[in-house]
Amino acid sequence: MNTGERTPISARTVLLFAAVGVVAAVLGLVPWLITGMRLPLQNLWAEPVVAPDGVTAAPESMPIALLPFSQYALTFTAALLITGAAVAGLAARLLRARARRGAIVAVLAGVVLSQLVALLQSALTAAAGLQDRLESVVYLTAATTAGVVAIVMGAVVVVLIARAPAGAAVVGLSIGALALVQWAQGLVYPIFSLVTQASPAIDAVLVWLPAVLVAAAIVWAGVSTVGRVIGALVSLLALWIGPAAITAISSAAGTRVYAGYPFEMAEVVGQIFRAALLSPATWRAVVAAAVIAAVGLALRRPVLRRLDGRSPS
């Protein structure tokens, strides 16, 4: 009889689960790793970063940073961290980590500590080259805080996906799906790249990918309980609010005009956020996800019945 007790695990198994978290964190950083990991050009950099001609910017001369530490890459950095966390949570669930005492903690420790190391290295690298002025301290603090918030959000995603019931896990999967789209965009179109060849087919996939992934998560969880219904609704809400928030934060953070005016910047963020919420593109994604999920749920029931009918009695 199943008593609900979790199986104790050895120290070796704990290390293996921790390694899963580390590998997931590294996978999350892939779109940045393939760029060469040069710290983005900084507005407050103390020394001029120019080519031998003395005029052209030379980003390749910037130091190595494990994260794209820049106000122009806040949402991309968050996507890298949350995607890695979502991969860790999914791996933990597939490996049935919640049935083993300490396994989820090991996975969580692996991914969070790895990401903290990456953030600390990037922040220290930036701090070493910034001008010695108040604006540098404010910028460094704000960017580091944003990274910490993303890591905390990722930790929540790990727990939701790896340990929570299906109704809550679908929310974690949906948050991970939104991050994955930004991750994929950075993989196809490397951030800060000067030359990119746009592909209409890839762009179309990136546009509809969030709706498809959120719908897939809803279909996986089902809607057989009140908790799962709530989880599905929250996932659709995240699909509506998440992209609007990303648009607002990216637009405001990338505008130097409001850098010294936090209240005005907050007002601009609010205006862009409200406009993005009412954008037809945002609503199309939500409607598409709802339709795909409805079709998937309708097909899910007979498929499960057929599978149950084939199982031995």
Please place each PLM-identified region on the residue numbering.
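Long, glycine/tryptophan/cysteine-rich extracytoplasmic
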Residues: 19-22, 28-78, 128-130, 188, ...
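Membrane-entry segments of alpha-helical transmembrane domains in multi-pass membrane proteins
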Residues: 10-19, 64-80, 101, 105, ...
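Long, hydrophobic/aromatic-enriched structural stretches that serve as scaffold segments
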Residues: 67-129
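Cytoplasmic membrane-interface segments at the C-terminal ends of transmembrane helices
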Residues: 2-14, 86-107, 127-130, 153-176, ...
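Hydrophobic alpha-helical transmembrane segments
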Residues: 71-92, 145-155, 206-219, 288-293
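Generic multipass alpha-helical transmembrane bundles of integral membrane proteins
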Residues: 115-264
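Hydrophobic core segments of alpha-helical transmembrane domains in multi-pass membrane transport
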Residues: 20-32, 85-86, 175-182, 212-219, ...
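Alpha-helical transmembrane segments
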Residues: 14-32, 108-117
